[in-house]
Amino acid sequence: LVVYLFFASGINHFAKLPILTNNVKDISKISNESLKDKITILGFFGKNIEDRYGDAGNLNQEIFKRFNEFKDFQFVMIQPKETKFLSDNLIKEMNRLTKTDFKNWKFVEMSDEDLVGVFNSLQTDLKLDANLGTSYVFIIDRMGNLRGRDDKEGAKFGYDSRFVADINNNMVDDVKVILAEYRMALKKNNVYK
């Protein structure tokens, strides 16, 4: 009876995903995309994008396929200029291997200076490599804030896309939480009515 009453009450109390950095630099001033008004998985594959095929495959399989039906969910990969051909090849290869529609994967080219500026605005303890890339991806909420974990193990700013364990043990749950928060906010504001 108690379990029934709990679920029937319709009140869900869950831990919210902490904001680790407010106001990540919005890219709308330097590109046609934005980090606002959508839940964004933000990444930096770098000039050596062909070395990130495994990372992209892990993200596609474990995150994108699970959540891509959510209309306000996107992947944004910030890329150095002159990498469009490499990004297009990655998408073609991923389409061929996975039969996935990558319409919500956006590859945005920008100058090295702008790319580093966006990365630095995350204010993490992580660094870009010499090719202006990292295997880490980040969750940005619809207000443009970096979300992650801050617990007894310390702050977790990003998720290492090289390792399925990090994605499955941490990122999947965190994306579920941020999407649940978003749905609750929509419901509270009567967006569904």
Cite the ranges covered by each PLM segment:
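Extracytoplasmic
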Residues: K36, F70-F73, L132-S135
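N-terminal targeting signals for export/organelle localization
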Residues: L1-S28
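Short active-site neighborhood of thiol/selenol oxidoreductases, capturing the structured segment around
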Residues: N32-L59, F73-V76
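Sec/Tat-exported extracytoplasmic proteins
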Residues: I63-F67, L122, L126, V175, ...
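Surface-exposed short loop/turn segments
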Residues: S111-G133
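Short acidic, S/G/P-rich loop/turn micro-motifs used as interaction or catalytic elements
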Residues: K47-R52, K81-F85, L146
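Structural microenvironment flanking redox-active thiols in thiol-disulfide oxidoreductases
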Residues: D55-F107, D112-V118
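Thiol-/selenol-based redox modules, centered on thioredoxin-like
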Residues: G133-K193
